[in-house]
Structures are given as structure tokens and as C-alpha cells.
Amino acid sequence: MNNINFLKLNRVRLRDGMRDKATTKFKEFFANIQGNVYGFKGYTILENDEDTNETLVLTFWKSKEDMDNYYSNTNYSLSNLVREVKPMFEKLPERISYNIVSFDLTK
């Protein structure tokens, strides 16, 4: 796990009734890119238990450079995903980068 050093938090505000459709699109997207994006280590989708219009998408990265390259304006696959799901958004996602200081999953 020590090769996961950075995380991008994507806070998504969805229109009413769009969560299931958006989650399906996100899962399909990640299934297609896994193993094909340098430095990409995985993702997690979190659905807010109290607010059905909020979803968090966390992406995990080997390096900040890998993460920044992926989230650049020149990434057409990400741009295409955003264009496809944009009608489901209440507003554009908020993106925040984090340095992972400690990451442990108990076995």
C-alpha cells in the first residue's frame, strides 16, 4: 500500500434522482481505465447516506505528477466523461488534492 501517495477528492452534487445513473457511469469509466493510466492505483465511490444528491469519488495515485497529468485539460477520456455526466450535475464537481500521510486497511 505504500505506493499510494496522493488522492484526489471529487465532490459531486447531482440533480434529484441522478445518483444511480451517475454511479453506474463512474463505475463503467473506471473499469475501462484501470490498468491503462500510469500511476492510477484505484478509486472509491462514496454515496452520502443523508444527502442523496452528494457523491464523493476518491482516486488514488502513486505520485502527484501522475495525478496532475491525469486531471489536466488535455485528458480527453476524463473530459468525455464529464461531458457525458454533466447534465446530471447540480454544479460542476469540486476537486481537492491530498497527500496521503497514512493509509492502512485492516485485514
Where are the predicted features?
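Glycine-rich beta-strand-turn "strand-cap" elements at beta-sheet edges
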Residues: 1-4, 44-53, 81-107
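Generic cytosolic/nucleocytoplasmic N-terminal low-complexity/intrinsically disordered segments
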Residues: 1, 7-9, 24, 74, ...
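Short, surface-exposed ligand-recognition loops at beta-strand->loop->(often short) alpha-helix junctions
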Residues: 13-26
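Intrinsically disordered, low-complexity acidic/polar segments
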Residues: 19-21, 54, 66-68, 104-107
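An amphipathic, aromatic/His-enriched active-site/gating alpha helix that lines ligand/cofactor pockets
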Residues: 28, 32-40, 60-96
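Short, well-ordered beta-strand segments in beta-rich or mixed alpha/beta enzyme
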Residues: 6-13, 42-73
